[in-house]
Design a protein with these regions (language model features):
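Gram-negative outer-membrane beta-barrel transporters
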Residues: 581, 585-588, 606-703
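Extracytoplasmic beta-strand/coil segments of soluble accessory domains associated
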Residues: 94, 110, 127-161, 183
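Short acidic/polar hinge/loop motifs at secondary-structure boundaries
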Residues: 160-186
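Transmembrane beta-barrel wall of Gram-negative outer-membrane proteins
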Residues: 222-255, 267-316, 335-353
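N-terminal periplasmic accessory domains that precede
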Residues: 126-129, 143-144, 181, 193-215, ...
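Outer-membrane beta-barrel signature, preferentially recognizing the C-terminal barrel domain
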Residues: 333-342, 389, 442-449, 518-581, ...
Length: 781
């Protein structure tokens, strides 16, 4: 009965606060009958998509609130008849380690960024935070470490691999506790981290009652765009609960200028220009409830859930100009759809004694998405593509830790995952005839099983020496029995791992870290699937396309890329959370995968077609040098800036080199790895004013990449700048304004790319998005 009363009281407090926030936000944004959160109707006719509908869902919870109100801890008779007694309030003081202390105490090299970094610019999505982190940049394939993405950089959510379809660009920083940038793989986490891992730790449950609200406005295409983030943490007895909620919308525009020199519709050389305008709009929400129950002093049960859903539309319109010949143009396009992610993890922790601990986890994941795309020529439908994806997974993991003597902590664990994916898509022409009759409309079903087992020993050799030894075996099998595109692929990797730390003094102000690791990159299901995707510019399968406009197919015979790595870093921890670090890394890679393009006779076309397909191409080497410096200016440069007590500086500079053995130099680098990158940032408290300002400048130079003996890829220099100003309005309220230029929301920086062939054919694309302004109001309620 006591637990029942506690739960109902807790529910009432949560629902009351949520209802107040929803009511306040609704009236703030909807002063009239026409709400600013407009309805977006994807062409696929999905459900109504007003943000106010989400608040309507709170009304459905009202019976629970009423039920909670009917229950009180003490009866009315008890309340009126008992004398009022003074109660000594229990005050809990919680000391939590900061980001610098956590980094210093880690047994392997990692950078940790907490609340200060997450909140500094009032960002609305996690990718905007990540692109300012040292050694991290953001491109079309998401965040990249050391210039390597597309599977080389592993994304983790609470230490587990992020499920397919998880959108970091739709995850609010207010729902994140901290971000860990891990330079080398460890035994407890998946070894699919050739470049490293980015571990996103979602909001944790605390024993303090907290309530925070963030209201934001951001510049959009036609009007300001709203976003709201609310989080509440409550604690009653042994129960702790947290509920972060995020609502967001976007409406942005990107301009593209595309120049082409390639064969036209008649097979003869042609020159063309296209000025494109891409407009994207949509809305979505994230909800991440977490519950902790302390069964006893030794046992804890935790439930962590995450729900994400959004609707989107995208339209591209071109103005075409034929400079010479009969060029082929990209079609105008209208597309829309939705995505949805659901995730739940249950964790049981039992501390048998001070020396023993077991942790067992079980989880379920679901992803759903659907889309339709119309290619238009002269206003008429040229192609119609519709599809949907369904991804379901069950995970189970556990680990047992045992303190052996006073110096060793032994850990053994397992990590199991069973994932099933169902894809279905159909492409028809304007007359409704299937483009590829033998493939269209067929459901692609695949199953992926991942099994990992590991052991680890953390050895405290002395107060100055630490050694972390681990061994992990990970096996991934992918299988599909689809008759048209069968897949059967198995990969198994044994990864020995060693991390050594030497502290020059027991206080750990200076240390050297070294790691020797074996990691790998496994091919995804889409790369294994041999189902062809016809290039939208050359849909006539009786005609040969071009090298620069190839069809795409997968390769079921791909082997995993293997990497042996060495990392060495020196870290000097300064006063006031300052740090200086310099590190080097080296990776030897085998079975490197590269998309290769060649002319083939294929079963689905009567004419030869240019096909691009991933293949295990060659071996490669990559290495780099990384610097990081941050701290108070008066500590870093006392003679020059000793008077600037409120000025903090942050900087990073990284140099990268790579070479693929099968390609001639000098630009035979790994895909997308820039020669160097830099970040320079500051924040300053203005003396005599309740105001803090700051900024960040990121620079990546232009570079060339040799894709093959026939193709070169060129990329221009990119620069992005961020500025912010923050003013506290009261002890519990602050106003923040931020601006960014040179970047695209949810995308790569502004710039141009050039794909050039040895025969002189090329495609050049310039992308530009307007600067963004963001205003946020933070309140502790």
């Amino acid at each position: 009965m006591k637990c029942h009363l506690i739960l109902n009281c807790l529910t009432l407090r949560l629902l009351t606060k949520i209802a107040h926030i929803a009511f306040f936000w609704f009236h703030m944004n909807c002063p009239s009958s026409t709400c600013a959160w407009h309805k977006i109707c994807p062409i696929s006719q999905h459900k109504p998509t007003k943000l106010t509908d989400l608040f309507g869902a709170l009304v459905l919870l009202s019976p629970f609130a009423v039920f909670a109100q009917d229950v009180s801890v003490g009866s009315p008779a008890e309340s009126s008849g008992s004398p009022q007694t003074s109660v000594i309030q229990r005050v809990e003081i919680v000391a939590r380690q900061g980001s610098t202390e956590l980094r210093r105490a880690a047994s392997f090299a990692k950078q940790i960024y907490g609340r200060e970094e997450l909140d500094r610019y009032g960002d609305t999505n996690a990718l905007d935070v990540m692109r300012r982190l040292p050694g991290v940049n953001v491109d079309t394939d998401g965040p990249r470490m050391r210039g390597l993405g597309a599977g080389y950089t592993q994304i983790l959510i609470n230490g587990d691999p992020a499920p397919p379809g998880f959108n970091l660009d739709q995850l609010s920083p207010s729902q994140i506790e901290r971000i860990e940038v891990i330079k080398a793989s460890t035994a407890e986490q998946s070894s699919q981290a050739v470049a490293g891992s980015i571990n996103v730790i979602l909001k944790e449950v605390t024993r303090r009652s907290l309530s925070n609200l963030r209201l934001g406005l951001r510049t959009g295409k036609d009007r300001p765009l709203g976003n709201v983030n609310y989080s509440i943490t409550e604690s009653v007895g042994p129960f702790n609960m947290s509920l972060p909620i995020s609502l967001f919308e976007w409406h942005r525009q990107v301009r593209n200028l595309v120049d082409r020199k390639m064969a036209g519709s008649d097979g003869q050389p042609a020159l063309s220009e296209q000025l494109g305008t891409g407009t994207s709009q949509g809305w979505g929400y994230n909800v991440a409830p977490r519950f902790n129950f302390k069964v006893s002093d030794e046992q804890t049960i935790a439930l962590a859930t995450f729900f994400q859903k959004g609707y989107w539309n995208y339209r591209t319109d071109y103005v075409n100009q034929a400079v010479s010949g009969n060029p082929v143009f990209d079609d105008d396009a209208i597309q829309g759809g939705y995505w949805e992610n659901r995730r739940g993890n249950l964790t049981w922790i039992n501390r048998f004694s001070e020396d023993q601990r077991i942790e067992i986890k079980a989880g379920v994941q679901q992803s759903r998405s659907a889309f339709d795309l119309r290619n238009l020529r002269a206003g008429a439908t040229q192609l119609l593509t519709a599809g949907n994806n369904q991804d379901d997974a069950v995970t189970q993991a556990g680990k047992y830790s045992q303190l052996l003597g006073s110096a060793h902590t032994f850990t053994a664990g397992w990590d199991l995952e069973n994932r099933e994916r169902l894809e279905k898509r159909t492409t028809t022409n304007g007359a409704g005839i299937a483009l590829l009759s033998s493939f269209e409309g067929q459901a692609f079903e695949a199953q992926m099983r991942r099994q990992a087992y590991y052991i680890q020993d953390e050895w405290e050799i002395s107060p100055q020496w630490q050694l972390n030894l681990g061994l992990r075996n990970e096996r991934i099998s992918s299988e599909s029995k689809n008759a048209a595109v069968p897949v059967a692929n198995v990969s198994s990797v044994l990864s020995p791992l060693a991390h050594l730390t030497y502290k020059f003094d027991p206080k750990s102000r200076d240390m050297v870290r070294a790691s020797l690791t074996r990691s790998y990159k496994a091919a995804g299901l889409n790369a294994l699937l041999a189902r062809p995707v016809i290039n939208s510019a050359y849909t006539n399968i009786n005609q040969t396309n071009t090298y620069l406009a190839p069809d795409r197919i997968g390769n079921a015979a791909l082997s995993p890329e293997l990497a042996t790595g060495l990392d060495i870093a020196y870290e000097n921890y300064l006063s006031n959370d300052g740090i200086f670090s310099v590190g080097i890394f080296h990776r030897n890679l085998t079975n490197v995968v590269r998309n290769l393009t060649e002319l083939r006779n294929v079963s689905w076309a009567t004419a030869p077609r240019w096909i691009t397909q991933p293949q295990n191409f060659s071996d490669a080497v990559t290495r780099g040098l990384e610097f990081e410096l941050r701290g108070r200016a008066s500590d870093l440069m006392p003679q020059l800036l000793g008077h600037a007590k409120g000025l903090n500086l942050r900087s990073s500079l990284s140099f990268y080199r790579s070479s693929i053995a099968a390609l001639p130099g000098p630009d035979n680098r790994l895909d997308g790895q820039q020669p160097w990158s830099s970040n320079l940032g500051f924040d300053q408290r203005i003396s005599g004013l309740p105001l803090s300002v700051g900024g960040n400048l990121s620079i990546t130079p232009g570079y060339d990449t040799r894709q093959s003996a026939e193709q070169m890829f060129k990329r221009s220099t990119t620069k992005s700048i961020d500025l912010f100003a923050m003013m506290p309005l009261s002890p519990t309220m602050s106003l923040r304004a931020a601006a960014s230029a040179g970047v695209q929301q949810f995308g790569p920086p502004n710039g141009n790319t050039l794909s050039l062939l040895s025969n002189g054919d090329y495609v050049r694309t310039d992308r530009y998005a307007k600067p963004q302004l963001n205003i946020t109001l933070d309140m502790r309620l």
